[in-house]
């Protein structure tokens, strides 16, 4: 995409650059395609991927939370993004959040030649009143058919295509001693500790799995951490549920699990399922749009969302049947 006449500089806008599925995709796009552009920039509130971006020669710009609806914050974000676009001669903006798309739609009035690509990483139950306006001049990418249908229902966009996420993972046969030192069956859940991920239902399900040799390891952090820890204590599961926080050694964690679980209430795609499959692990997941495009009866088990009893039954099934785990993971 480089040319000898006009600069071709791209700016990715994400809410954060912490550990998460969308953030990982932003990092992969920024680094994998950097040779296709003269300059690659990323703007967000920051996070653990900042250091990796810097190592790859990609400049990160810290901005306020694009999800904020406070008028003063909105004005500051508009000013910040306009400055970044002007000073770095940005020609293409790739947004990864609905409000970020809204900001760029407004800024296109000041920068009319600006090209805008928007990737929808999730399905949304709520409707953003200005969503249709935000995508009015954008080329839109949906990460799954479920996300595509969500966009079509919300904004009637005719410029949307489905491109499934891919995963670029390091190869490793190592494990994590903190996990493998535990006896019995080890279940892994790699997720942001947020309402979307359905983790209270998973913890409730663990209380119904009475086998004391079955342990759950939660890899991730988020706003529900304290609530989930308290729920674990109330159910007297402290010895069987382990909170590992954010980890950079995700592959090694997956290698240490007997199988993985994704109890999401809603999801755009379910990138963690691909990660599990790539590392030879099967998956229990909720039967919801987006996830059920990845997980099926040939590679895992699907259960209804928000159903601890069904989730517990699936956990018992895989925990007690190593041959089933192996056949699904093959």
Language model feature labels by segment:
Residues 297, 301-308, 316-323:
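Conserved acidic donor-binding segment of nucleotide-sugar-dependent glycosyltransferases
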Residues 12-74, 223-224:
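N-terminal strand-loop element at the rim of the active site
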Residues 42-43, 282-285:
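Short hydrophobic beta-strand element within catalytic cores of glycosyltransferases
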Residues 246, 265:
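Aromatic "clamp/platform" in nucleotide-sugar-dependent glycosyltransferases that forms part
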Residues 112-145, 154-156:
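A conserved, positively charged/aromatic
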Residues 95-101, 120:
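Short His-centered aromatic/hydrophobic patch
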Residues 20-31, 185, 189-208, 223-229, ...:
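A conserved mid-protein helix/loop that constitutes part of the nucleotide-sugar donor-binding site
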Residues 37-39, 199-242, 318-325:
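A conserved nucleotide-sugar
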């Amino acid at each position: 995409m480089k040319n000898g006449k006009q600069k071709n500089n791209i700016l990715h806008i994400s809410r954060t650059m912490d550990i998460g599925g969308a953030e990982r995709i932003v990092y992969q796009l920024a680094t994998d395609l950097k040779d296709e552009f003269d300059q690659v920039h990323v703007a967000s509130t920051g996070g653990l991927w900042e250091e990796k971006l810097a190592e790859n020669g990609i400049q990160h710009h810290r901005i306020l939370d694009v999800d904020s609806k406070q008028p003063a914050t909105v004005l500051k974000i508009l000013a910040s993004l306009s400055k970044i676009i002007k000073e770095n001669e940005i020609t293409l903006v790739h947004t990864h959040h609905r409000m970020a798309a809204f900001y760029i739609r407004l800024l296109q009035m000041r920068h009319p030649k600006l090209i805008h690509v928007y990737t929808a990483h999730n399905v949304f139950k709520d409707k953003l009143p200005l969503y249709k306006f935000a995508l009015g001049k954008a080329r839109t990418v949906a990460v799954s058919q479920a996300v595509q249908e969500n966009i079509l229902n919300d904004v009637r966009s005719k410029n949307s295509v489905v491109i499934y996420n891919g995963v670029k993972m390091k190869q490793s046969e190592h494990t994590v001693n903190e996990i493998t030192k535990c006896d019995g069956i080890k279940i892994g859940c790699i997720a942001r500790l947020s309402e979307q991920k359905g983790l209270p239902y998973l913890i409730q399900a663990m209380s119904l799995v009475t086998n004391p040799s079955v342990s759950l390891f939660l890899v991730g952090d988020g706003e529900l951490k304290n609530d989930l820890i308290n729920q674990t204590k109330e159910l007297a599961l402290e010895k069987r549920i382990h909170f590992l926080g954010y980890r950079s050694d995700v592959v090694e964690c997956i290698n240490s699990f007997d199988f993985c679980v994704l109890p999401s209430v809603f999801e755009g795609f379910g990138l963690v399922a691909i990660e599990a499959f790539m590392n030879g692990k099967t998956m229990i997941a909720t039967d919801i749009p987006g996830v059920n495009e990845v997980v099926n009866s040939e590679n895992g088990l699907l259960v209804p969302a928000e159903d601890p009893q069904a989730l517990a039954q699936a956990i018992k099934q895989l925990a007690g049947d190593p041959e089933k785990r192996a056949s699904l993971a093959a």
